[in-house]
Regions:
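P-loop NTPase signaling cores
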Residues: 1-166
């Protein structure tokens, strides 16, 4: 049984369906949050502080096969299997809250723990200002055969913000 926080549909805040985006060489692609569940590559979700990354990850963790933890919990856990439990996909929040000595340390520490778990699928969140794209993506590429995908959380528009606050 995982010891990480496991919200249910009843404990997760009702929130507005979010949109994420990523760039290809040709264009910018928008992705509704439900489509995250269909993706199989390593996912890195980026957004500004307070944009709802943690709420989005809590929502993901309500689905069968997903288990949520923070990056710090994963790094300091002696036996990371207790965080994954029976899940197949680890949802890792708040990479930006891990203090590292140099660029890439936090990503390397997370990947080391994922290695102890046999490199399961994962979703990782980080503040965009703290994510070192080239360093982080290269480190993930070295351990995973699928190309990682950076997804940016789209900010609320005025109508969404009003609906969220009501």
């Amino acid at each position: 049984m995982p010891t990480s926080f496991q919200p249910t549909a009843q404990t997760v805040h009702e929130f507005i369906e979010r949109t994420l985006w990523f760039e290809t060489e040709e264009s910018r692609i928008e992705l509704p949050q439900r489509d995250i569940l269909k993706r199989t590559e390593p996912l890195v979700i980026l957004g500004e502080a307070g944009m709802g990354k943690s709420h989005l990850l809590e929502w993901l963790a309500t689905f069968p096969g997903y288990s949520r933890c923070t990056a710090n919990q994963l790094i300091i856990r002696h036996d990371p299997k207790t965080l994954l439990g029976d899940a197949k996909i680890l949802v890792i929040d708040a990479l930006d809250e891990v203090s590292g000595r140099k660029e890439g340390d936090a990503v390397d520490e997370v990947l080391k723990k994922l290695g102890e778990l046999g490199y399961p699928r994962f979703v990782l969140s980080c503040r965009v200002a703290d994510w070192r794209s080239a360093t982080g993506l290269e480190a993930i590429r070295e351990q995973y055969s699928d190309e990682p995908l950076e997804l940016h959380l789209t900010p609320f528009d005025d109508d969404d913000a009003t609906a969220f606050l009501v």
